[in-house]
């Protein structure tokens, strides 16, 4: 058994969708989350910029004595997963391969992928899906504006529905069977996405397969926690009030504390 916390990072509030699943599946695990809202958004940054930011956060989490790091951000997974796996002395997992694996476990013939500009531009999902199932037809489309809708607390509004309708127009008449939510902000827009695409299109949230793999890894290393008083500590590099608002809305069982942090160049 290992009561050390699991470290989780994202560019903003999206990582809360992964923490929500983590708490459902592994309620006895403590969590330390860093939302890098001071550098939001990641989706329009260069690979090198994202790597630098992710490495700083990884070093901070290491200082908090985490036993594992989850990159709860598709953009950062695509840009920095391999780097962090090489640089940090703990297991580091991302969300892209689990998301692709979740999609290919079903016998879909045609699916869609939405993500940030960066995630879609570098073809992270398309490449991974092609390796897992070369016969799968994949339509990828950036939906960068939807990230800000979530970050600004506008889910459930007419503005959110209009933005979703516009960004997902590319899938009109395409007969996709499923859609990978290739940004951790997007699960908070599932209602609006279903309204646009119809309930027959399956929405794939990579968080579920990601946490399943995390549990499998920790089980194999005998590092699962038996802590009955587990905690969720949240940190923001931006305005902690925004993270508090998101946590109050999307973490049904609450959190332990939320604070602002500054991450210097050395991490």
Swiss-Prot record:
GO terms for molecular function: glutamate racemase activity. It holds the Pfam family Asp_Glu_race. Belongs to the aspartate/glutamate racemases family. It catalyses: L-glutamate = D-glutamate. GO terms for biological process: cell wall organization; peptidoglycan biosynthetic process; regulation of cell shape. Pathway: Cell wall biogenesis; peptidoglycan biosynthesis. It is an enzyme of class 5 (isomerase). This is Glutamate racemase. The active site is at 73 (proton donor/acceptor), 183 (proton donor/acceptor). SUPFAM superfamilies: Aspartate/glutamate racemase (SSF53681). Substrate binds at residues 10-11, 42-43, 74-75, 184-185. The keyword Plastid does not apply. Gene3D superfamilies: 3.40.50.1860. Provides the (R)-glutamate required for cell wall biosynthesis. Keywords: Cell shape, Cell wall biogenesis/degradation, Isomerase, Peptidoglycan synthesis. Its EC number is 5.1.1.3. NCBIfam families: glut_race.
